[in-house]
């Protein structure tokens, strides 16, 4: 059991501040963040060049220490040493909150183990900022950060998450979004998704629609800039039906004058099946019937 009194405690140690930085718009930097960065003894920065530009903009002269995922293991003992000597440290990532898809978690754990106060200086967070403007249910939600890059691993990931009812938040590179949506469509079915691009910047854009609609849009206009995907959770109200029942519903629509492809598309959408998989299954059923 441990109780931390962030500001009223009597610890001789310095404090570890986790300071949020802008995710694209410098006007989102808070007064408290600027003041904290000016007052601490050290700034542990993911990229000292990027952070250097931020510090210059706000006239901050505090010394920096490089701290990122590739040197964290060797740097953490040094940083803990500074903190135990009574010096304060602000940890920043290139954008947003430290530890959220960025280095910092291991440093936080090490500080807590040494009973060093860890203090959040809140601010911009891309995932939550995109979620609240997405139009999808803001809670419950699950933030996953960056997806596996390899297609096979990504498909396994989506297969394990397809039945989750929570809204899901992902970061993705613009040149991988199309492949990611294809993999998602295969496992999730054609559910609602929001693609958020260049959040807080001049070219900020939201594309809202079904996964298949976004794929068509991306094919026509390739993406640029940093991207997030906000995906609708699995519906808990959709009646489960086996293939035979779905085939019957498709036939009813066809008999009512609907074209086969449109009938399959509507049934797949209603029951949250993957359209391509249902089409292939229906085609095989037709041939063998």
Labelled PLM ranges:
Residues 1-67:
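Glycine-rich, flexible N-terminal cofactor/catalytic loop recognition
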Residues 2-5, 13, 167, 174-289:
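A contiguous loop/helix-start segment that scaffolds small-molecule binding in enzyme catalytic cores
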Residues 15-16, 86-90, 166-167:
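Loop/turn-to-beta-strand initiation segments
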Residues 23-25, 94-98, 174-176, 234-236:
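Short glycine-rich anion-binding loops that position phosphate/pyrophosphate groups of nucleotides
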Residues 37-43, 115-119, 167-168:
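Short active-site oxyanion
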Residues 67-73, 147-150:
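Conserved helicase motor
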Residues 79-125:
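Glycine/small-residue-rich loop that forms an oxyanion/phosphate-binding "nest" at active or ligand-binding sites
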Residues 107-161:
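Class I SAM-dependent methyltransferase SAM-binding "motif I" and its flanking Rossmann-like core
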